[in-house]
């Protein structure tokens, strides 16, 4: 049974304008928006990315969609740091919850999360579906 559904869309340029140029690893590692949104594991990928603005926009959209699926949004016991986005060996996106996000998922009776991320020239979008057993 579906216990949560969230979607988000982000204008990539809005995020990319706040991100230093690719290749400037020192500046990227200090990027305030990235430090707020990304976990340590995500930050390592961001710093090495050839398109850091696009990478951050996609992660931002995914985490906002997840927070909406949890029914809280960001800031009501759930932070960006409580949600981690990674990829499996085939490149499919995976989502993991810690802290307040994991607590909220448990409260909803959720046991599985499905994530889809898409991007085009100007926009990144994500949808999260939470399921119970």
Swiss-Prot record:
Biological role: Transfers the 4'-phosphopantetheine moiety from coenzyme A to a Ser of acyl-carrier-protein.
Transmembrane segments: none
Annotated binding of Mg(2+), by residue: 8, 64
SUPFAM superfamilies listed in its UniProt record: 4'-phosphopantetheinyl transferase
InterPro entries in UniProt: 4-PPantetheinyl_Trfase_dom (IPR008278), 4-PPantetheinyl_Trfase_dom_sf (IPR037143), ACPS (IPR002582), Ppantetheine-prot_Trfase_dom (IPR004568)
Biological process according to GO: fatty acid biosynthetic process
Keywords annotated in UniProt: Cytoplasm, Fatty acid biosynthesis, Fatty acid metabolism, Lipid biosynthesis, Lipid metabolism, Magnesium, Metal-binding, Transferase
E.C. code: 2.7.8.7
One Pfam family matching this protein: ACPS
Family in the record: Belongs to the P-Pant transferase superfamily. AcpS family.
Reactions catalysed, as given in the entry: apo-[ACP] + CoA = holo-[ACP] + adenosine 3',5'-bisphosphate + H(+)
A single cellular component GO annotation: cytoplasm
Protein name from the UniProt record: Holo-[acyl-carrier-protein] synthase
């Amino acid at each position: 049974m579906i216990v949560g559904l969230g979607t988000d869309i982000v204008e990539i340029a809005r995020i990319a304008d706040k991100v230093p140029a690719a290749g400037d690893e020192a500046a990227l590692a200090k990027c305030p928006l990235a430090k707020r949104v990304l976990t340590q594991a995500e930050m390592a990928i961001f710093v090495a990315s050839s398109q850091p603005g696009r990478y951050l926009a996609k992660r931002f959209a995914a985490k906002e969609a997840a927070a909406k699926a949890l029914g809280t949004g960001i800031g009501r016991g759930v932070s960006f740091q409580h949600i981690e986005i990674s990829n499996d060996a085939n490149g499919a996106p995976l989502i993991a919850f810690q802290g307040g996000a994991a607590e909220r998922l448990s409260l909803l009776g959720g046991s599985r999360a499905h994530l889809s991320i898409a991007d085009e020239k100007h926009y990144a979008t994500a949808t999260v579906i939470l399921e119970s057993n």
